[in-house]
């Protein structure tokens, strides 16, 4: 178990790191070529706005208002009240809510984006709420993902990330963390398969350029937000 000081440091690092990643990556989101960052953006005005973080604050608000046993249906009610993003899976889920469909139907019905990254990118909250307890982190991640990714690879991506991030409070070896996290997603999922293949290529010692080409060959998708290619 980590002590309170370590816990605070890791949670703070998680939130700051998420802001850094979004601020650097946000301006080039959707570009498909290999990117080499040599200069950092001007952050004198603070980090860029980031829906990855905004939605986690909505979920945190749901927990504060409704208690820790919050369900997918209750999370979808929070979305209906506080979320107004029109794009991709968010927009389809919100349209379904306006039809009267709560989660998980809000995330499943007529939604072509269930396999995308909208839910994996908001997994950190469940890890920091349940550090060292991946089972509970995954359970909440699944409830969250059902709001806009029910039945899709996006749900498995959020579950994988929540497990890995929760265990990272006590484990520091990246390969070990990835292998352990894979136990929390279906073996026949594309997310799980893509990550296992990528581990194999990494351990064979080939270049990252080759690994990238293999990922795109086996799991590539014209939609840049498709989860398996991004997570791998």
Which residues fall in each region the model found?
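Accessory "access/gating" subregions that flank catalytic or transport cores
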Residues: 2, 7, 11, 97, ...
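Active-site cavity-forming subdomains of large catalytic enzyme subunits
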Residues: 16, 47-50, 55-56, 60-151, ...
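Conserved phosphate/anionic-ligand binding catalytic regions in large, soluble enzymes, centered on
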Residues: 15-26, 115-122, 226-230
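Solvent-exposed, non-transmembrane amphipathic alpha-helical segments
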Residues: 31, 36, 40, 44, ...
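An N-terminal structural lobe/cap that precedes and organizes the functional/catalytic core
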Residues: 1-58, 75
